[in-house]
Amino acid sequence: MPPTPWAPHSYPPTRRSDHVDVYQSASRGEVPVPDPYQWLEENSNEVDEWTTAQTAFTQGYLDKNADRQKLEEKFRASKDYVKFSAPTLLDSGHWYWFYNSGVQSQAVLYRSKKPVLPDFQRGTRKVGEVYFDPNVLSADGTAIMGTCRFSPSGEYFAYAVSHLGVDYFTIYVRPTSSSLSQAPEAEGGDGRLSDGVKWCKFTTITWTKDSKGFLYQRYPARESLVAKDRDKDAMVCYHRVGTTQLEDIIVQQDKENPDWTYGTDASEDGKYIYLVVYKDASKQNLLWVAEFDKDGVKPEIPWRKVINEFGADYHVITNHGSLIYVKTNVNAPQYKVVTIDLSTGEPEIRDFIPEQKDAKLTQVKCVNKGYFVAIYKRNVKDEIYLYSKAGDQLSRLASDFIGVASITNREKQPHSFLTFSGFNTPGTISRYDFTAPDTQRLSILRTTKLNGLNADDFESTQVWYKSKDGTKVPMFIVRHKSTKFDGTAPAIQNGYGGFAITADPFFSPIMLTFMQTYGAILAVPNIRGGGEFGGEWHKAGRRETKGNTFDDFIAAAQFLVKNKYAAPGKVAITGASNGGFLVCGSVVRAPEGTFGAAVSEGGVADLLKFNKFTGGMAWTSEYGNPFIKEDFDFVQALSPVHNVPKDRVLPATLLMTNAGDDRVVPMHSLKFVANLQYNVPQNPHPLLIRVDKSWLGHGFGKTTDKHTKDAADKWSFVAQSLGLEWKTVD
């Protein structure tokens, strides 16, 4: 079909004010910065009316695609297949695992009726019994289960519940003798205890050895779940099962450092409680350790501050007595494993598994009472190795696999489970059994079977291209085997490039369906700012060097066209959250004609205001701080809102945000689209925004129906903006 007709300069009106903010620059002194759309930061009737008008205008454009409903139906069908997690054996003798029959919004927690591992290879038939079904927590599917944890005794199940995807959760507790499979009358589900622990955000649930209570992180109560005020004054509390939250003990809070946040864990033997302390989103934390007190948790936990300077990343793997094993990047950008002896006056730190210079250590688990399984990422492909109790590499596991792997296990048990996935691998779970003969230890436990799609019809390859400064960057390219690399295919280019997060291969039935339907390819460049190659790769794409991230992303699109992987003008870029920032920044930076379309979901766009809202202060380690004069110049230069060009044609652009997004607040998308529409009113391609007022959070936990409808809007926009032809026969 030809691109949907577009009449420039037809947007709903947007008021401009004379608001000006003044910043301090180390090179320029006082810098006045006009902010005519400052009023879009507010929760006001005017903003509500404006977003309603803009969204209705966008919907009018989307409604012109006659294939949109048909595309939504194909997306929904593509998601209808059985999904599952690796199982875990509790001390109670029950196996537990998550299972989704197809299009359930949330996976259901099942358990075995006997201590024997169920036979999961019996087709797609369900095995075991339902223990906890989070889909019945609310009639409309808006109650979402987040983190959850069983007590060491297996007697209790603690689970966090959020509504409409907000980042704040309430933790509930229920006995494992009480299942939930039908719609409840009580908040959090019938059969639970009266405990309700509120205002938890980015929390872990760490049970104490005696199973009498757990540690969690919370914030002070707010007037509203979607208040935009800056997050501060996090605290770690201890909740004793069967008591009210008012009785909870604060075990850690630092009023002098209100931006600090915390994570907790406990050793599997119950000997130690671990506390990690973060000052921002950088890969630097403190590590404090305390021995579990048999008399219970008290307000003044005697923390031993093993690592008490922010300089590197430290995360405990396990302990053998007083010797703890820690994964760290101290003097090792690619990470290594060290041991720390807590029995000495001054903790002794020694290398255990040394750094590999050409591969990043991403995950390490202790297995079978002292062995270790380590996953390395070499050129963005996972490799799995088994190590001895002495730290010697013994063997490589599943050497023929290409993709992403993860480990599920309990270290005292003789079995571990490896989950494999990739662009055309929906999911395979293998079991590694130390009690079996060497050649029979690794076996397939369960394989995902699709309905409608054939994953074998797709293939992926990895290429390397040069960025603007000559740096070589890897990129995955995925296609349906019938799609030719002859310069005629449209391309979907997805990226992230920030916070040391790796853009791993991922399985998406919706993406594969779109590719098959329109003959498109998928490109995923592993740009700087991510974690693909350790700390140096991240450092090369943050703060002052953040421009490299955009250069890498733009160069990827140019490479696709030049080498005939994609057609000129047919590259559509997409990204969410920080990836949305990547999209917005690339739109305003790229030469005219580089992209044909762009979709940003919940993206950061106003870099002069981001750290004033919710958790934004933590991102200053990534973006810089606009209120520090030494940072101001490079932050302003990075900000999409403040760098919209007036002298060139921009690609068709759709910004998607939720009205109550409490992580990346919607003002980012609102102000960016207002500037786009004002600066280039005669742009021959639409510059649109869709504000969802039915969902509050950053995108977490959407129902299957809602996720499918959102995807249909997104990909329908791409198809109609690029003028893509429906190729498959239905």
Curated annotation (Swiss-Prot):
The keyword tRNA processing does not apply. Its EC number is 3.4.21.26. Coiled coil: none annotated. It catalyses: Hydrolysis of Pro-|-Xaa >> Ala-|-Xaa in oligopeptides. GO terms for biological process: proteolysis. Monomer. This is Dual function macrocyclase-peptidase POPB. It comes from Amanita bisporigera (Destroying angel). The lineage of its organism: Eukaryota, Fungi, Dikarya, Basidiomycota, Agaricomycotina.
